[in-house]
């Protein structure tokens, strides 16, 4: 399906959500929670069943029913299902992705109390899917994060299944040697849905109330960069904020990609930091590092060797440094550009 359809619901009627019984996973745990954030499903009854009679009596089915129509049925297990979030994505959707695709904008607006503009809503809609929901889709559909050749002998250095959200949700199912009645599974599912839903709401609020407002600060710093240094390679933020993704996006918008190399900002103690700009938002490789001879030095030794008073540290890897004043971190950045 190419278009995103929404079912028109009669809010005066009591709604019923249905998902499958038995063992549960992260995707339907989140899908059910997201639906219940919406006014039309806030007080909906939840039925966990594989009985077609229960499906027929329900208003919406997630992760069960063997079909997807974007109105009542939101399953992804059937043959021939290859739906993705949009044409930019290749990951096949799970029930979490399907519900978010159709209801995500309304879900975000509900979490943020409708305090979001149309353009910002579109940005958050993509951001939340990319940073959170897509990974659940991939996990449930058995899609690896990496494309690894079949003949590869790569082995992980450690196991992280138990600390991943899908792993935690899986562990919330009843143990095999405990009560495994439908009632027990339903109680455990309710706890799992609340757990992953809480993580999701915290994430959306963080993006809407912290990450998104930071864009204006980064944009202003970029616009004023020539007042900081004539090279245009250093920007100053009035305080720390999530800046990396905004920096890359704004560079593209302003056609100045890869030109900014250092970001100055205050930390929580009131001291100043100079950060290199990574080649991407998750990399420790940087466009330009702090001076090699100063890496790993601290305090007086660093101040003496650099000739810059008030230095605190430069990380041994050269990606960040600290000092007591804006002037000091500016000088460290300038030394790196020389």
Swiss-Prot record:
**InterPro entries tied to this protein:** MYG1_exonuclease
Q: Which GO terms describe its cellular component?
A: chromatin; cytoplasm; nucleus
Per the record, the domain of life is Eukaryota
- GO BP field: positive regulation of cellular respiration
Query: Which Pfam families is this protein grouped with?
Result: MYG1_exonuc
Family (UniProt): Belongs to the MYG1 family.
Query: Further notes on this entry?
Result: Present with 6080 molecules/cell in log phase SD medium.
Name of the protein? MYG1 protein YER156C
Annotated source species: Saccharomyces cerevisiae (strain ATCC 204508 / S288c)
Lineage, top ranks: Eukaryota, Fungi, Dikarya, Ascomycota, Saccharomycotina
């Amino acid at each position: 399906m190419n278009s995103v359809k929404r079912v028109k619901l009669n809010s005066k009627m009591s709604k019923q959500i249905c998902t499958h019984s038995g063992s549960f996973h992260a995707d339907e745990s989140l899908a059910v929670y997201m639906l219940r954030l919406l006014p039309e499903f806030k007080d909906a009854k939840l039925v966990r069943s594989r009985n077609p009679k229960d499906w027929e009596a329900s208003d919406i089915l997630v992760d069960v029913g063997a079909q997807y129509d974007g109105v009542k049925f939101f399953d992804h297990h059937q043959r021939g299902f290859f739906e993705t979030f949009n044409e930019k994505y290749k990951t096949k959707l799970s029930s979490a992705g399907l519900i978010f695709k159709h209801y995500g904008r309304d879900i975000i607006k509900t979490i943020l109390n409708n305090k979001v503009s149309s353009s910002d809503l579109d940005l958050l809609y993509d951001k939340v899917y990319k940073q959170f929901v897509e990974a659940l889709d991939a996990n449930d559909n058995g899609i690896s994060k990496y494309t690894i050749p079949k003949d590869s002998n790569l082995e992980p250095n450690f196991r992280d299944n138990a600390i991943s959200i899908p792993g935690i949700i899986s562990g919330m199912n009843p143990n095999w040697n405990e009560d495994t009645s439908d009632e027990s599974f339903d109680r455990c599912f309710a706890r799992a849905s609340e757990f992953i839903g809480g993580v999701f709401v915290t994430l959306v609020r963080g993006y809407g109330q912290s990450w998104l407002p930071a864009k204006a600060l980064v944009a202003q710093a970029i616009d004023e960069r020539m007042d900081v240094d004539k090279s245009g390679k250093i920007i100053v933020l009035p305080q720390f904020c999530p800046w990396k993704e905004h920096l890359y996006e704004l560079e593209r918008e302003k056609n100045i990609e890869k030109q900014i190399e250092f970001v100055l900002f205050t930390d929580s103690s009131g001291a100043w930091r100079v950060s290199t700009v990574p080649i991407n938002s998750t990399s420790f490789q940087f466009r330009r590092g702090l001076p090699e001879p100063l890496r790993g030095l601290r305090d007086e030794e660093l101040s003496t060797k650099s000739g810059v008073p008030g230095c605190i540290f430069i990380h041994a890897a050269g990606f960040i440094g600290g000092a007591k004043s804006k002037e000091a971190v500016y000088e460290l950045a300038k030394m790196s550009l020389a």
